Amino acid sequence: MLRTLYRLAVLATTVGVGLALVAPAAAQDMASFEKRLTVHTLANGYTFLILERDGAPTFSFATRVDVGSAQEVPGITGLAHMFEHMAFKGTPHLGTKDYQAEQRAIDALEEAYRTYERARSATTPDTAEVERLRTAFKAREAEAQTFVVPNAFDDAVSREGGVGLNASTSAEATTYYYSLPSNKFELFAYLESERFLHPVFREFYKERDVVMEERRQRTESQPIGRLFERLLGAAFFAHPYKQPTVGYMSDLERFTITDARAFYDVWYAPANMVTAIVGGVKASEIIPVIERYFGRLPAKPKPAPLRTIEPPHIAETVITLRDQAQPFYIEAYHKPAATHPDEPIYDAIAEILGRGRTSRLYRSLVEEQKLAVQAQVGGGLPGVKYPHLFLALAVPARGVTNDQVRDALRVELQKMVGEDVTDAELDRFKTRAKADLIRSLTGDSGLASQLVTYHTLTGDWRELFTYVDRMAAVTKADIRRVAADVFKPSNRTVARLENEAAQAPGGTK
């Protein structure tokens, strides 16, 4: 949900700043935003949003590439996330002892891996031959490793005062970000353009092993991680939102440098990238620098939009995972994309129903009935660009079953359909929405992230401000209408984590 972006940006700011102190500055920002924000698009299609702000001589940026796990196809799931890892491995001039020799070693490594992969994927693999080829592949990998200067990209940024160097991959985007002193802007332009102009696939298979271990730790060894993955698979039977961002293990074990290069060639087109720059910069001074460095990226066609549309669901789906773990209960309801006119109403429902200790679910299930130790609502799973999921979830208290939690939760959902919310609940939602926006404007990093996200999702960064006005216009009747439309059994996917011991014959309930 779009309001989630406000909340995420708040985390990047000093939330403790008094609202009364921040509000005048925020109001001034909104009034003067268009005067201080420049949108500049290069000839190759790359768009930059530049917001000049007074204050510290620093700037923050966020680059959003319009590609995530939803753009992957079977066989290469996890490759968007994998390329994010590769983007920190340096450039032809940074992170290597001898780039030309290293490239020859990487080419030989790739050929060795593909030969090994063909052998082990044969219908009747020759075990001895497979092991011989694996040994040859590992030898090539060790040879390529001798040219690597570890952490060179990270060190180059931190050495010049950079902070917050990171990136993230979601179902629909890959985002890169950090902050630097303003007098290091040309360094930013060089590093960021260079790593996308000349991507290197340094330590690719070593990093692939890291990603596989990440999957093992976060999904395969975590019952709740497995539950959410199965939930997505059950809720989406056509749309690629069902694919995990980290990828399926069978794909991680087999995709190659060749696959990664092909993926980059299609999706890392300048027309598919937007960068927001916020802080102590002057657009007139930095645009020539942007042109000089980022203008080097060759123009490519913007990839075609995703065609697949999830068909309407006609029946409730229930999945149950049994493990030696705390029971966990999730209901997921399909909802429209974040650009739908009803999006602010979904935010209101989420706020009133399940956000925080004053929400209906928390008060009813946790405090009053003591059926759960946690109860909340969330949106935006696994993304917001396409129709996605609205979640209601609860963790049963000791001795309470998922069935008991389910019944109590559904009572609260149906109240949203059959009864008006109170004036106090609606007013609290609108007040918090404004407060979240105000706080999100205080930090350069959070604001850069919001600008680039709103611009790519809605086509206009101004939606960052107009959206709060749309939330202010939500009515009680709107909430009942949308709740009646979404909280239907046929629109529901249920995921249950049951304690295996409690289900076994003679097990305790």
Language model features with spans:
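Bacterial N-terminal signal peptides
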Residues: 8-20
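Short beta-strands and strand-coil junctions in structured, solvent-facing domains, enriched
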Residues: 68-73, 93, 198, 283-284, ...
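Non-catalytic beta-strand/loop surface segments
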Residues: 26-71, 100-183, 205, 217-270, ...
